[in-house]
Amino acid sequence: MERRQFLTGLGLVCLMACTPRTQSVTLSPGTTLIVVRHGEKDGDALTSAGVARAEALASALADTDIDRIYSTSYHRNIATAEPLAEAHGLSIETVPDFDVTPKILAGNAGRTILWVGNKGNIAPMWDVLGLTGDAPLAYGDLAFVRADETGRISVAMTRFGS
């Protein structure tokens, strides 16, 4: 019986050691992170409503200076970002959708960057950044997460498209 308890305990310790740890990430002063979920989808493709929403995103951010656009490699995310990328003359940089926040913030201090994500990576991003309130998980939600020159974080939520 003691051996079974020992092995069970050892198994739990090993399992805990293999569990990824999410570390807190800080937005550098002067940095703006714009977060949006991909448009409406059918499988991995955008529906006509999703295509319209992608165009609406480009219109909503037409006057916003954006330095970099990041997305997962899913077609629906890239298709959501394409009209905006084209309008701004930017490429879309794909990032694996696990542990996104440190990957997209690295080397972007003082810049404005856009993340076109999914429910499964936007919600953890909110947690990693220590943000309160609801993450922008609905179609048409648009979040502007800003760190002012002192590093104080503010979040402005808006909607775009119909």
Task: Please give the residue ranges for each predicted region.
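Short beta-strand segments
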Residues: 116-118
